[in-house]
Amino acid sequence: MANTTSAKKATRKIARRTIVNKSRRTQMRGAVRTVEEAIAKGDRDAAVKAMTRCEPELMQAAQRNIIHRNAASRKVSRLTQKIAKLAK
């Protein structure tokens, strides 16, 4: 339990930030899921369209320290490779 007023305030700030970060993480995961579903169906056009929405979501999450920037780049790279395989 926080004793000082600054520690109590920090606890409140963390709680607010956690809610925002969870929301952004959920939004990011949903964007990734739509790309993966389109890839699973074999629908290249839908996958490309979903990827144009997904990539900025991942990069913004990395900028806001919700996920690591290397993790975001790795996810984008792997999804892009899967989409490229659909073209063949």
UniProtKB/Swiss-Prot annotation:
<keyword id="KW-0694">RNA-binding</keyword>
<dbReference type="GO" id="GO:0003735">
    <property type="term" value="F:structural constituent of ribosome"/>
</dbReference>
<keyword id="KW-0689">Ribosomal protein</keyword>
<dbReference type="GO" id="GO:0006412">
    <property type="term" value="P:translation"/>
</dbReference>
<dbReference type="GO" id="GO:0005829">
    <property type="term" value="C:cytosol"/>
</dbReference>
<protein>
    <recommendedName>
        <fullName>Small ribosomal subunit protein bS20</fullName>
    </recommendedName>
</protein>
<keyword id="KW-0699">rRNA-binding</keyword>
<keyword id="KW-0687">Ribonucleoprotein</keyword>
<dbReference type="GO" id="GO:0070181">
    <property type="term" value="F:small ribosomal subunit rRNA binding"/>
</dbReference>
<comment type="similarity">
    <text>Belongs to the bacterial ribosomal protein bS20 family.</text>
</comment>
<dbReference type="InterPro" id="IPR002583">
    <property type="entry name" value="Ribosomal_bS20"/>
</dbReference>
<comment type="function">
    <text>Binds directly to 16S ribosomal RNA.</text>
</comment>
<dbReference type="Pfam" id="PF01649">
    <property type="entry name" value="Ribosomal_S20p"/>
</dbReference>
<dbReference type="InterPro" id="IPR036510">
    <property type="entry name" value="Ribosomal_bS20_sf"/>
</dbReference>
<dbReference type="GO" id="GO:0015935">
    <property type="term" value="C:small ribosomal subunit"/>
</dbReference>
